[in-house]
Amino acid sequence: MEFVFLAYPSCPELHILSFLGVSLVYGLIITGNILIVVSIHTETCLCTSMYYFLGSLSGIEICYTAVVVPHILANTLQSEKTITLLGCATQMAFFIALGSADCFLLAAMAYDRYVAICHPLQYPLLMTLTLCVHLVVASVISGLFLSLQLVAFIFSLPFCQAQGIEHFFCDVPPVMHVVCAQSHIHEQSVLVAAILAIAVPFFLITTSYTFIVAALLKIHSAAGRHRAFSTCSSHLTVVLLQYGCCAFMYLCPSSSYNPKQDRFISLVYTLGTPLLNPLIYALRNSEMKGAVGRVLTRNCLSQNS
């Protein structure tokens, strides 16, 4: 059995434009996130738990986009835009696993900010490298476990004869739309998985930031308040982008499914968010900006010498 992707433009000129546009964005995503990872691993001033989480987030987003974007680029230039049942299940499994890990990791980063601002004296003792590694590994394993359960459930359902998917890749809503035995139970099962991956981490993030805001209001120094807020604002911006798109995609009922709207939101969190994350963290964080600048300078000097 094969699925056919129906969302690609039929005009040959648009194929080339789409390929060039997506290639450019993908190149910027890989470059930006690799710069973040390299800067964090080479700059001693960034050897803290906050930057360890940021480096892990960038690493996950490199893998996250690599699951779908190369396939999108290949399909853009191919006449037959198909994928096998196994290929679709594999793509969805990795995409959901890494996307869920991303959400769980953002919750861990919120906890890190909570400890740093609300318990600054205990921060070095509480947020050890061992704990950070455990939280990152737990995020990935939890995402993988949730993904395997969801994908096994979806692909155990019968699919209709016309396997046309109104999308660019195998995401949950468009694939569920071609399931023949759609029922309230199936929709609720997918919703439970979405709540575990999106709503629960978002609740933990909201709780962390409630305590953070309360702590910030107690800081009398304007400079101290501004510094604390600047370290949180980057993370909060990324959270709103990521969770806003994911909630719109996965927490809405299937009756409100709109293929065109769905595709646009998918492009935002598949290409837009991974592209903006390095920019947000680099531009809003002076330490990160300085580290990236030094890495680029060293690279330019080594090439010129």
Swiss-Prot record:
Transmembrane residue ranges: 17-37, 46-66, 91-111, 131-151, 189-208, 229-249, 263-283
Matching InterPro entries: GPCR_Rhodpsn (IPR000276), GPCR_Rhodpsn_7TM (IPR017452), Olfact_rcpt (IPR000725)
Superkingdom classification of source: Eukaryota
Listed GO CC annotations: plasma membrane
Parts of the chain on the Cytoplasmic side: 38-45, 112-130, 209-228, 284-305
Topology term for the membrane: Multi-pass membrane protein
Main location per the UniProt record: membrane
GO molecular function: G protein-coupled receptor activity; odorant binding; olfactory receptor activity
Function text: Odorant receptor.
Database matches in PANTHER family: OLFACTORY RECEPTOR (PTHR26453)
Family in the record: Belongs to the G-protein coupled receptor 1 family.
Name this polypeptide is given: Olfactory receptor 10W1
